[in-house]
């Protein structure tokens, strides 16, 4: 029996990954992390989506220590989300160590479940400047987990080379475009669906959807070229 663990936030990307995983694996488990994030409503959204989509289990893990250590606009309500980059060239929504911690814990969970695949929705094409969304990081993390647990564990990143329009097309391929559009939470300000319309996450999501809806055939053709599936 094939098993996978999906790192699941209830946002557009991780929901698209979950939908795809449910069609590809016999047993899919979701894991959501509560780190005191600004958009904490995403945890309730994640609960609702995993229930509706039918995961084998949904684990919510308290990692509030990350929120205490990592100072970011996503962990401090007093820090407004900015469209400008910080002095280090990163957005102020970057949470240092987040994906290192998430993938480590998801890997441990997969080990206990007997799953050999961890799925995460990180993307280098539209990665907002986050270094822990790069393919080089994922490969290094995969190697570290394999060595550290003496287990063959695959970190699968189905969105790594897709742009946002292609991610919308992937959700549509599985018949879940409207679910992703109306019931996920990507907005940094915690508003479901189309979100606040002002934060960087909302801008990226909206632009991708508009690109897809106005160029469906071309976007689907590019998606097929990248994924090798119809």
From Swiss-Prot:
<dbReference type="GO" id="GO:0008616">
    <property type="term" value="P:queuosine biosynthetic process"/>
</dbReference>
<dbReference type="GO" id="GO:0016879">
    <property type="term" value="F:ligase activity, forming carbon-nitrogen bonds"/>
</dbReference>
<feature type="binding site">
    <location>
        <position position="202"/>
    </location>
    <ligand>
        <name>Zn(2+)</name>
    </ligand>
</feature>
<keyword id="KW-0547">Nucleotide-binding</keyword>
<keyword id="KW-0862">Zinc</keyword>
<feature type="binding site">
    <location>
        <position position="196"/>
    </location>
    <ligand>
        <name>Zn(2+)</name>
    </ligand>
</feature>
<comment type="similarity">
    <text>Belongs to the QueC family.</text>
</comment>
<protein>
    <recommendedName>
        <fullName>7-cyano-7-deazaguanine synthase</fullName>
        <ecNumber>6.3.4.20</ecNumber>
    </recommendedName>
</protein>
<feature type="binding site">
    <location>
        <position position="187"/>
    </location>
    <ligand>
        <name>Zn(2+)</name>
    </ligand>
</feature>
<keyword id="KW-0479">Metal-binding</keyword>
<keyword id="KW-0671">Queuosine biosynthesis</keyword>
<keyword id="KW-0436">Ligase</keyword>
<keyword id="KW-0067">ATP-binding</keyword>
<dbReference type="Pfam" id="PF06508">
    <property type="entry name" value="QueC"/>
</dbReference>
<dbReference type="InterPro" id="IPR018317">
    <property type="entry name" value="QueC"/>
</dbReference>
<dbReference type="GO" id="GO:0008270">
    <property type="term" value="F:zinc ion binding"/>
</dbReference>
<comment type="pathway">
    <text>Purine metabolism; 7-cyano-7-deazaguanine biosynthesis.</text>
</comment>
<dbReference type="GO" id="GO:0005524">
    <property type="term" value="F:ATP binding"/>
</dbReference>
<feature type="binding site">
    <location>
        <position position="199"/>
    </location>
    <ligand>
        <name>Zn(2+)</name>
    </ligand>
</feature>
<feature type="binding site">
    <location>
        <begin position="8"/>
        <end position="18"/>
    </location>
    <ligand>
        <name>ATP</name>
    </ligand>
</feature>
<dbReference type="InterPro" id="IPR014729">
    <property type="entry name" value="Rossmann-like_a/b/a_fold"/>
</dbReference>
<comment type="function">
    <text>Catalyzes the ATP-dependent conversion of 7-carboxy-7-deazaguanine (CDG) to 7-cyano-7-deazaguanine (preQ(0)).</text>
</comment>
């Amino acid at each position: 029996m094939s098993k996978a663990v999906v790192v699941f936030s209830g946002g557009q990307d991780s929901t698209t990954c979950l939908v795809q995983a449910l069609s590809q694996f016999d047993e899919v488990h979701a894991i959501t992390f509560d780190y005191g994030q600004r958009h904490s409503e995403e945890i309730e959204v994640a609960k609702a989506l995993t229930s509706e989509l039918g995961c084998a289990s949904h684990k919510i893990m308290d990692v509030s220590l990350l929120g205490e250590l990592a100072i970011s606009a996503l962990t401090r309500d007093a820090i407004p989300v900015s469209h400008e980059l910080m002095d280090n060239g990163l957005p102020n929504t970057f949470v240092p160590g987040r994906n290192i911690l998430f993938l480590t814990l998801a890997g441990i969970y997969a080990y206990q479940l007997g799953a050999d695949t961890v799925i995460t929705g990180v993307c280098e094409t539209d990665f907002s400047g986050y270094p822990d969304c790069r393919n080089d990081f994922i490969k290094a993390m995969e190697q570290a987990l394999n060595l550290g647990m003496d287990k063959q564990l695959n970190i699968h990143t189905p969105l790594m080379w897709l742009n946002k329009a292609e991610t919308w097309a992937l959700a549509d391929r599985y018949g879940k475009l409207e679910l992703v559009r109306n019931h996920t939470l990507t907005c940094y300000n915690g508003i479901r669906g189309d979100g606040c319309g002002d934060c960087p996450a909302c801008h990226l999501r909206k632009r991708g959807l508009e690109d897809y809806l106005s160029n469906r055939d071309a976007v689907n053709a590019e998606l097929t070229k990248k994924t090798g599936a119809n």
